Design a protein with these regions (language model features):
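Short, mixed-charge amphipathic alpha-helical segments
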Residues: 119-120, 176-214
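Solenoid-repeat scaffolds in large eukaryotic assemblies
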Residues: 142-144
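Charge-enriched, short contiguous segments at helix-coil
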Residues: 199-256
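Internal, Lys/Arg-enriched amphipathic helical interaction segments that engage polyanionic partners
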Residues: 19-114
């Protein structure tokens, strides 16, 4: 390897510039710039390596984010219009920490979220308003089934496949939509296909299962093993699913 190939890029550029004809002021500026760049590179020897790692991380961001959101869903929570990056931190802390965080976040953003949902689907306004009022009144036994029903219907309205049924049809529709989806929208769409406590079989009624999320099948089929579902946190979890479904189809390219 020739010696010139070992010369830093900044030095090569500086040498090339210095061989050109400049007036004294421009030459002084070039010298000053060279010194500053050299000093900066000496002070940050790992800059290029760090930049390369950053670009690699950015490239893998959708896959990593999907992993976080999938984990959150397995614990009964979905992101929404107002979710912050802090959600990732609490997902890592586990069920109890995520419950406390999401409960506070959704309650703080309740008016904004409910208003956005109704604005997105005005034809459903009467039903949605009723569901939100039932939740506000503490009538969670009634609000939860309505949240599930509207999430199911909104999914069908957009994909021509229900959220809690039509598994193969929904899968094919998601694959087709993902081809022309905006960045990250394909990741959100794929989350509609994963297995969660929300869409688990009726046989999943043990205490550990019910702590994660309300089981839609148990609730709507009146399972005697899930008669204790009517809690505030379960209603908030069902609402988070509804808000997420609305978010997924909020892009103009996806709304039919």
């Amino acid at each position: 390897m020739s010696e010139s190939k070992n010369i830093p890029l900044v030095q090569v550029l500086a040498n090339a510039l210095m061989k050109s004809s400049f007036d004294p002021k421009l030459e002084a500026w070039v010298n000053d710039l060279h010194e500053k760049i050299s000093s900066f590179m000496q002070a940050n020897p790992n800059l290029l390596s760090d930049l390369r790692h950053f670009l690699d991380d950015f490239k893998n961001l959708p896959a990593r984010q999907k992993e976080v959101w999938s984990k959150a869903a397995s614990l009964g929570w979905y992101m929404n219009f107002e979710s912050s990056i802090s959600m990732k931190h609490y997902v890592g802390l586990g069920q109890q920490a995520l419950n406390s965080y999401m409960e506070k976040e959704i309650q703080a953003d309740w008016i904004t979220l409910t208003t956005s949902i109704i604005a997105a689907y005005p034809a459903r306004a009467e039903i949605l308003t009723c569901a939100f009022e039932l939740h506000n009144e503490g009538r969670y036994i009634a609000s939860i089934p309505l949240f599930f029903a509207q999430a199911d219907g909104i999914c069908d309205q957009n994909l021509d496949a229900h959220l809690f049924a039509d598994g193969e049809k929904r899968k094919l529709a998601i694959v087709e939509r993902s081809r022309n989806a905006e960045p990250f929208t394909d990741v959100l769409l794929e989350l509609l296909q994963i297995k969660t406590p929300f869409n688990a079989r009726i046989s999943k009624y043990e205490a550990k299962d019910k702590l994660r999320a309300p089981n839609r099948n148990c609730i709507l089929h009146g399972s005697c093993n899930h008669l204790d579902y009517g809690t505030e946190i379960n209603s908030l979890k069902a609402f988070s699913l509804l808000a997420f479904v609305v978010l997924v189809f909020s892009k103009e390219s996806l709304i039919q």
